[in-house]
């Protein structure tokens, strides 16, 4: 990571959460923080589950979600319905024609996001 203090990281999003509360934005309804691309490492090879980049997110996304929620805020996260995100991280890889493998993987990824205590937004990046 070229600039660990300026790149997407738990440190950055914790700071955003602090500012939303301390500067009064949360009281005015700004209660959502959305993590964009570049939060993922490669899938866990043993389980095929999505996993956060441990360098950027020590303790993973659940630790960040717990911090954000402790401030009375909500945490959302971006992913892509294709094989990869625009930055090349793993996507949800749902085929255009549903099959049991794609459906099972999508369900597993949704369960992973739910276990992290977050909401996922899904886009599509054609690259």
Q: Where is each model-derived feature located?
A:
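Aromatic-lined carbohydrate-binding/catalytic grooves of carbohydrate-active enzymes
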Residues: 2-5, 9-127
């Amino acid at each position: 990571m070229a600039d660990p203090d300026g790149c997407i990281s738990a440190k950055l999003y914790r700071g955003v959460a602090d500012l939303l509360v301390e500067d009064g934005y949360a009281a005015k309804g700004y209660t959502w923080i959305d993590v964009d691309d570049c939060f993922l490492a490669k899938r866990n090879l043993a389980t095929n589950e999505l996993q956060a980049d441990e360098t950027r997110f020590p303790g993973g996304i659940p630790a960040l979600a717990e911090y954000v929620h402790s401030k009375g805020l909500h945490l959302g996260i971006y992913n892509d319905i294709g094989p990869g995100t625009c930055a090349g991280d793993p996507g949800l890889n749902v085929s255009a024609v549903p099959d049991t493998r794609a459906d099972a993987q999508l369900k597993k990824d949704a369960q992973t996001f739910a276990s992290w205590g977050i909401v996922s937004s899904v886009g599509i990046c054609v690259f």
